[in-house]
């Protein structure tokens, strides 16, 4: 529950600071990391770029 609340607050913070509204959804099509919420990055899946969790180094 706390994680969901935190994600919601981060998305609302992005909207409040003037960024484009984003949907916090795994696998959402994107053009850059700005199209994704904090815990996701815009990564290639081979065919297209989608919001996914960053696997790290």
UniProtKB/Swiss-Prot annotation:
General function of this protein: This recombinant peptide inhibits voltage-gated potassium channels mKv1.3/KCNA3 (IC(50)=1.70 uM), mKv1.1/KCNA1 (10 uM inhibits 40% of currents) and hKv1.2/KCNA2 (10 uM inhibits 42% of currents). May also increase intracellular calcium release through the activation of nuclear inositol 1,4,5-trisphosphate receptors (ITPR) of cardiomyocytes, thereby causing an increase in the contraction frequency of these cells.
Instruction: Kindly list the GO molecular function terms attached to this UniProt entry.
Output: potassium channel regulator activity; toxin activity
- Descriptive protein name: Potassium channel toxin KTx1
User: What domain of life?
Assistant: Eukaryota
Q: An example Gene Ontology cellular component term from the record?
A: extracellular region
The species this protein was found in: Isometrus maculatus
Q: What is its main location?
A: secreted
Q: What is known of its domains?
A: The presence of a 'disulfide through disulfide knot' structurally defines this protein as a knottin.
Miscellaneous comment:
Negative results: does not show effect on rNav1.2/SCN2A and mNav1.4/SCN4A.
Keywords on record: Disulfide bond, Ion channel impairing toxin, Knottin, Neurotoxin, Potassium channel impairing toxin, Secreted, Signal, Toxin
| Localization per Swiss-Prot or TrEMBL | Secreted
Summary of the tissues where the protein is detected:
Expressed by the venom gland.
Q: Which residues form the propeptide?
A: 14-18
Family membership noted in the UniProt record: Belongs to the scorpion calcin-like family. KTX subfamily.
Disulfide topology: 24-37, 30-42, 36-51
Q: Does the keyword Magnesium apply?
A: no
Signal peptide bounds: 1-13
Q: Does the keyword Disulfide bond apply?
A: yes
